[in-house]
């Protein structure tokens, strides 16, 4: 019985397509006052391209808004996915924000902390270095070390004469 209905539906569809092509010849996009900028020289009855009109509408602000919306939706999806993964990982059906204090302490401190004493802080260290004593003067026969490369120190005229000799 369904096999007999199929050709009838096909015939109705075919008839509608034929009517569409017959009457579509008179349907032309006229270049009115609002559309004149997007038509070919304003003389043809058909507008050249609706893509030019859409391209004008999709300015930088609209494109930025679309990109922001897509990124925002991706962030929401990622947040939901993370929430679902965390809930599935726990296998206890823990709701977001409902965590017991004992559970938090078990995460932070897996075992008891070591005892804290002040002994090492209050002890006076007896191994201090010896008090400062000035080193003996070096002999005057040693020459001073050479200057570092790129030394930008200005020399006096007497030093320049010594260096030039």
Swiss-Prot record:
Membrane topology reported for the UniProt record: Single-pass type I membrane protein
Keywords: Membrane, Signal, Transmembrane, Transmembrane helix
Organism, as annotated: Rattus norvegicus
Name the UniProt record assigns to this protein: Cysteine and tyrosine-rich protein 1
Cellular-component GO terms for this entry: membrane
Record field: compositional bias (Polar residues): 153-165
Side of membrane Extracellular, spans: 30-61
Protein family: Belongs to the CYYR1 family.
Domain of life: Eukaryota
Transmembrane segments: 62-82
